[in-house]
Amino acid sequence: KTSTRTRCAFEVAARDQGAGVTYLEPSASQIRHKESIKDTARVLGRMYDGIEYRGFGQDVVEELAKYAGVPVFNGLTNEFHPTQMLADALTMREHSGKPLNQTAFAYVGDARYNMANSLLVLGAKLGMDVRIGAPKTLWPSENIVARARAVAEETGGKILLTENAEEAVKGVDFIHTDVWVSMGEPKEAWQERIDLLKDYRVTPELMAVSGNPQVKFMHCLPAFHNRETKVGEWIYETFGLNGVEVTEEVFESSASIVFDQA
């Protein structure tokens, strides 16, 4: 998958530590074209001290890790985004003013993919109060939820899944969201997703429902919060939405900590 923040973060971090970096884009390598993941892993593992993978399939990064013989870092798959969780946990710790196990956060929107899955597991591991607000058809898989609940039982974490966005955000310290249509999905998905999620937009009104004057807004970016991109303008012209998952008012407000998070 294409990347701005994740790639830059890995490259800057590596170079800050004196490490060399090679970027292999999909069109410039033989992965899954002329060479299997298993063979690629064994070759790269002999040349490099670590591998970061960013792509669609969780199975790919797990196969790389199985055969590379060196650490493999998951920079994002459809299922999980663990390195983003390091940033999110640090950001919430910096802005909450209290221990993470006394902190509550909500994720509202399409909860089937990497960000909601990862936030659910993160919150469970850290003993946090986690709420997911989404239509039931867009909830995380039962397997992910069961795993998170099992972990939360050990850490004292709380997990709530609800179709009511207002119920999800009441009393929270942070409200997270993500794009409603993910990389690789067709344009046709927008209409269905907007119809399903129109009541889950992060607006000033939803922020106020939290009842917490210090509530913060988080988004892993990129975000559709105005018309200043080609896609944002297309969404406005097609659906009449200026900002999709979050409004410009929230994104540019003092409650927004998205750039600290990024």
Swiss-Prot record:
Sample GO molecular function, one term: ornithine carbamoyltransferase activity
Effect of Y48F: In strain: Vedros M1801
Pfam families to which the protein is assigned, alphabetical: OTCace, OTCace_N
GO cellular component, one term: cytoplasm
InterPro entries referenced in this protein's UniProt entry, alphabetically: Asp/Orn_carbamoyltranf_P-bd, Asp/Orn_carbamoylTrfase, Asp/Orn_carbamoylTrfase_sf, Asp_carbamoyltransf_Asp/Orn-bd, Orn/put_carbamltrans
Alphabetical keyword list: Amino-acid biosynthesis, Arginine biosynthesis, Cytoplasm, Transferase
Predominant location: cytoplasm
Annotated localization: Cytoplasm
Annotated site residues (Important for structural integrity) in this chain: E94
UniProt binding sites for carbamoyl phosphate: 3-7, 30, 54, 81-84, 219-222, 247
Free-text function comment from the UniProt entry: Reversibly catalyzes the transfer of the carbamoyl group from carbamoyl phosphate (CP) to the N(epsilon) atom of ornithine (ORN) to produce L-citrulline.
Family recorded in the similarity comment: Belongs to the aspartate/ornithine carbamoyltransferase superfamily. OTCase family.
Protein name, as recorded: Ornithine carbamoyltransferase
Organism per entry: Neisseria mucosa
